[in-house]
Structure formats: C-alpha cells, structure tokens
Swiss-Prot record:
Gene deletion effect: No visible phenotype under standard growth conditions.
SUPFAM superfamilies in alphabetical order: Protein kinase-like (PK-like)
Swiss-Prot/TrEMBL keywords: ATP-binding, Kinase, Nucleotide-binding, Serine/threonine-protein kinase, Transferase
Active-site residues from the entry: 426 (proton acceptor)
Tissue: Expressed at low levels in roots, stems, siliques, leaves, seedlings and flower buds.
PROSITE patterns reported for this sequence: PROTEIN_KINASE_ATP, PROTEIN_KINASE_DOM, PROTEIN_KINASE_ST
Protein's name according to its UniProt entry: Mitogen-activated protein kinase kinase kinase 3
Alphabetical list of InterPro entries matching this protein: Kinase-like_dom_sf (IPR011009), MAP_kinase_kinase_kinase (IPR050538), Prot_kinase_dom (IPR000719), Protein_kinase_ATP_BS (IPR017441), Ser/Thr_kinase_AS (IPR008271)
Organism: Arabidopsis thaliana
Length: 560
C-alpha cells in the first residue's frame, strides 16, 4: 500500500491508517478497510472549496482528538469479536472529511491474498494519519489553502511510481485504492460525471447572476486601477461605454457682464503707498459684505474635514462629512490679507457664490451653503467622486462613445448657462468632474487659476484653451459665449488625443499662435464626426461659431 505524505503547512496526512475501531482489517501492519464507524469525531472546521488544474478539492474537516483508540479484530463469519487487545495507539492525527460522500458506497480493495479484507463501507467519511513519515522530499508547489501550502512530495517508503501529494479527492466517487495520486477529471477520464456536474453548476451560477431586466448589460468596458483584493477576487475600477449618465454640471462660472475689457501684462500696485492706497480699506468692506450676503440653502452646522481633493492659489478643496453622514465638498478660502491679489480673490468669491446660488439645473454643481470662522470662508458644494476628465483620460483611453457622451452633457450645461446670460470662461478637462454614474459636472477646484484673466502669464494651463478674441483683448460677442465654444472644441480635442491643445508650445508661444488665429493640430486619425465637430468650434471669427443649442444637434453627439 502507498504511504504518501500530504503537507499543508503543519498538517501531515497519511493514507496508511483509518482510526475507526469497529471491525478493522489489518494487512501488513496497516489498516486497509473498516465497517461503518462508531466513533464520530467532533464538529470541525471547514475550509473553502479550492480547485487545482486537473483535480478536485473537497470540503476538509480536521480534528485533533486526544483519546486512545484500541484496535480490535472481529470475524465477519460468526459476528463475534475477539476481546484481546491487539494494539493501542494515540490519535493525534488529522481527519479528512469528504463532503459529498456521506451516502456513497465506497469499496476498499486490499491485498489479494486476504480476500476477507475486502469490505464495503456505507459512510466512509473520516481518515487520520498514523506515524509521521520520517523521510520525504518536497517538490513543486501545488497551491495554497487556509491552513498552509500544498506541495508535491515523495516519501522514502512510498510504493509505486507516483508520489504526488495533492490532497485532492473527488467528491462523488471514492477511489478503488486508497491513494493520493492525482485523478483525471477531463471529459474522457473516469470522473466524467464530476466534470459534467461542474459544468452544469457553473452554467446555473451564470444564469442566476444575469442582469435584472431594468439594468442595461455592460458590453464594452475598460479596467482601471485596483481598488482592493479579497480571498477569491480582486476589485477594479472600470469605465463603460454605455453607462455614462445624461447629466452634466458646471462650476466656477463668472457673470458675463464682468468679462474684462482688455488683458494687461502690467502688475498693479495695491500697497498703501501706491496709486490705490485706499484699496486695503475697500477690501475690508468687500469682505464684510461678502460674509453678510451668505446664503445657506442647507443647514450644515456640524461637519468634519477629510482628505484634500485639490488646491489652487486662493482655495483648497476638501472632502467633508456632515453629522448626518452626508458627504460633500468644501472649498476653503483664507480671508486674511493676500496683498495685491486679495481684491481679485474676494471679487471671485462674491461672483461665484452669487452665481451658484442663482442656478438650479441638473447640469450645474449644487451649491449647498457657506460658513466662516475667524480667518476662513467655507463654500459647501456637491461632491463628485471620480475626479476630473483629465484624470480619467490619463487612466483610460477614452473611446469616441465616451467622449461623445461627455460632450453632450457639457453642451447641455453650457446651453443653460448661456441662456441665463453667463459664461464659464474656463472649459477644459481639468475642470470637468465625473461621478460614479458617468455624469459630467463642470467645476474648478483651483479657484484662482480658473478666472485670472488680468494677467495672461499667470493663467498657466488655462491659456491653451483661450479663444483668439480673449487673447486679442476684445469681446466682440457681447456676452462672451463664443469663447466657451472655442474652449469646448479644444476640450473635445483634448479628450480624443489625451493631450492639451498646443502641447508642443510654451504658454507665451501659444498666446501668439492663438492671437494670430492658428488652430491647434487636429489629427486626421480622428473620426469624421469628431474632427468636424472640433473644427466647427474652432472658428477664428466668433460670429461664425455655432451656439451650444445648435451643437446639441451635431452628428457627433446624437449618433451614439
């Protein structure tokens, strides 16, 4: 008989002995077969179902009984028992329980010279080790279980050519010989019905987990960053072509009547000794007026500040949670004197709060109120969880379907804004956020960078999306809405290519190119609809650019 060791961490199981003391057949010093057991082991611990290639794991239950078992022999002919003690052995081993064999008849074939040692067991559920194999060699790694590792091994006392220690036993049929050799579970093998049963179980599992009727199945998607790992699975972020929502919002929008008449490169002296010596006192009055004009559509009285989401020159944006467990975004602005930039900061805050409090639309970031302390102003806004479109195209290569869906949502928000007489003035991927449902929301977490148009050199990345009339210090449209359309064309180009417009130029070089009416490079590899949409937006003459309402009927955003 084979004496094959199975190692799983500190667990060693042998196929040599079965410690059930009722009617034991002793062949060559080893117990080969038994009748139905009398001793029932205590409840044990079940391990998860694990499958290795070409083999089958069953549920394993292990016990560590400390009692001493006396072996007794009996005669199957007269059903009388020999009371003489044959051997005493301490059961320190591990039982292996076969989960699905409780009602299977499992014959044990033993030595041909001893025909009486062949018996049939109605419930052969338990096995235990005898003595530890003193000499064995560890070979290749087979797998990992909760209790340790399983290796292929060979014993110095093993019989036969196979010495694989796999500890994998079929659940529906017990082998004719007690052996831990690998079994053939292919369709042509002796355990074909096991294979077929697994296929049926797998098919039933898939059938039971199909999508509900009210949920559109995901047919095309891209895998993103790893979110977490579990025992049997890993969880990733993913983006779908068909799961993008229909809502979009817009944040940091400046009233059109405040569009600057011209852009100057001169720095202004806001010190007390300068030509604007009374500006400090004026700043205090503006700050007090801003605080007095707070609107609180929602009463957020107690909240905790969380992780940083973004930072600009004037403001930082944090995640926050209220005492009711509601999450939102907090834009934190210092009210301390910031020198020559303080007046502009306060003007921006006043304009943004006034604008957000007026807008109520599904495509506009929801304004949730304001608060203040001694030195800081807090603006509460809707929290958008998935980050900016810029971060998304850096993680994924956005398909034309996704770009088209995002563009349609941006247009819906711009159309509402322009009808209200406002312009956004900073349309770009970094200012568009996406929630978990694929809804695009325009925002600006870098408050200062979003509307600092008095100094082109300080506009940093914003300059690359500016329209020619903005660079050339004129607003020929009256309310500036064509400037948003130009920026939208640059934004769609950015989403399609994964690069900002004029990416090969420095800011000052790009300013001269844009001012002269030189278009950014639009690759010929883009789809015809995408290319036509971008070039339609990038008309040098603002009067030739379509409105947001007209672009909502463009084939690029309706032929999905």
């Amino acid at each position: 008989m084979d004496v094959t060791a199975i190692f799983a961490g500190d667990i060693l199981v042998q196929s040599r002995e079965y410690l059930i003391p009722n009617d034991v057949v002793d062949v060559d010093g080893g117990i080969k077969a038994v009748r139905p057991p009398i001793i029932q082991p205590p409840p044990g611990r079940k391990l998860p179902l694990i499958d290795f290639p070409g083999s089958s794991w069953d549920f394993l239950t292990y016990f560590a009984p400390s009692k001493t078992v006396k072996r007794q022999s009996s005669s199957s002919s007269d059903n009388t028992s020999d009371k003489e003690e044959v051997e005493t052995e301490e059961t320190r081993g591990m039982f292996v329980q076969l989960g699905d064999t409780a009602h299977e008849a499992c014959p044990f074939a033993t030595n041909e010279a001893d025909s009486s040692s062949t018996v049939s067991i109605i419930s052969p559920s338990y096995a235990s080790r005898g003595s530890i194999v003193p000499s064995w060699l560890k070979r290749k790694f087979l797998g990992r279980v909760s209790l340790g590792f399983v290796y292929e091994g060979s014993s110095g006392s093993s019989v036969g050519s196979e010495s694989t220690c796999s500890l994998m036993t079929p659940s529906l049929e017990f082998p004719d010989r007690i052996s831990f050799r690998k079994k053939d579970f292919s369709e042509k093998g002796p355990s074909r019905h096991v294979w077929e049963k697994r296929k049926l179980t797998r098919a039933k599992l898939i059938e039971n987990f199909c999508n509900p009727e009210d949920i559109e199945p995901v047919t095309s998607w891209l895998k993103g960053q790893l979110l977490g790992e579990e025992s049997f699975a890993s969880v990733y972020e993913a983006i779908s072509d068909s799961s993008v929502g229909s809502e979009s919002t817009c944040s940091l929008m400046t009233p059109s009547m405040e569009f600057p008449d011209r852009i100057s490169f001169r720095k202004r002296d806001f010190s007390e000794e300068g030509p604007s010596g009374r500006v400090k006192e004026k700043r205090k009055l503006m700050r007090n007026k801003l605080i007095e004009n707070f609107r609180k559509p929602e009463d957020i009285t107690s909240w905790l500040k969380g992780q940083l989401l973004g930072r600009g020159s004037y403001a930082s944006v944090y995640e926050a949670i209220s005492e009711d467990g509601d999450f939102f975004a907090v834009k934190e602005v210092s009210l301390l004197d910031k020198g020559i930039q303080a007046q502009e900061c306060i003007q921006q805050l006043e304009g943004e709060i006034a604008l957000l409090s007026q807008l109520q639309h599904q495509n506009i970031v929801r304004y949730r109120g304001t608060a203040k302390d001694v030195s800081k102003l807090y603006i509460f806004l809707e929290l958008v969880t998935q980050g900016s479109v810029q971060k998304l195209y850096e993680r994924y290569q956005l398909s034309y379907t996704v770009v088209s869906l995002y563009t349609r949502q941006i247009l819906a928000g711009l159309n509402y804004l322009h009808d209200k007489g406002f312009v956004h003035r900073d349309i770009k991927c970094a200012n568009m956020l996406v929630d978990a449902n694929g809804t695009v929301k325009l925002a600006d977490f870098g408050l200062a960078e979003a509307s600092k148009f008095n100094d082109i050199m300080s506009c940093k990345g914003t300059l690359f999306w500016m329209a020619p009339e903005v660079i050339n210090r004129k607003d020929s449209d009256g309310n500036g809405s064509p400037a948003d359309i130009w920026s939208l064309g640059c934004t769609v180009l950015e989403m399609c290519t994964g690069q900002i417009p004029y990416s090969d130029l420095k800011p000052i070089q790009a300013a001269f190119k844009i001012g002269r009416g030189t278009l950014p490079d639009v690759p010929d590899t883009l789809s015809l609809d995408a290319r036509h949409f971008i070039l339609t937006c990038l008309k040098v003459n603002p009067e030739e650019r379509p409105t947001a309402a007209e672009l909502l009927h463009h084939p690029f955003v309706i032929n999905l």
